[in-house]
Amino acid sequence: DSRYAMATVIFVNIWRSFPYYTISFLSAMQSIPADLNEAAAVDGAGMFTRFFKITLQQLKSVSLVIVFIHIIWTAINFDFIWVMTEGGPNYATETLPIMIYRYSMKTFDVGAASALSTMMFTAMFIMFLFYYRK
């Protein structure tokens, strides 16, 4: 059913990358100095205040990295989408890499595939510049 195809692909994408994100957040949380939480507790900060003012603030940079990595990984996904749906029923799960593959290998329209690849490279390059700017 084309209504559930993209939701299934999104679920599999999240499920497949969940361990990486979990380990990244775990290592970031373990690197937060315990002195910060102790000092805030001594100053009278509650559990929720410490979580929002200390823990989340310390995880902000890791969260940004994870979001950018996930966007980049999702943008270049081809393999598991092709294996699961080949672009889906009625093109429901067709992403840019699958469209490039269809143009280049199925219809042999190499010019359109090259133009789409150049656009995809430009978009990824801009994301990399934004990511490394910080």
Predicted regions mapped to residue ranges:
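Generic structural signal for small/hydrophobic residues in well-ordered secondary structure
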Residues: 11, 19, 39, 44, ...
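Membrane-interfacial helix termini and adjacent extracytoplasmic/periplasmic loops
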Residues: 1-14, 79-94, 102
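A short glycine-centered flexible hinge/capping loop motif at secondary-structure junctions
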Residues: 43-45, 87, 110
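Hydrophobic residues within alpha-helical transmembrane segments
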Residues: 11, 56, 64, 68, ...
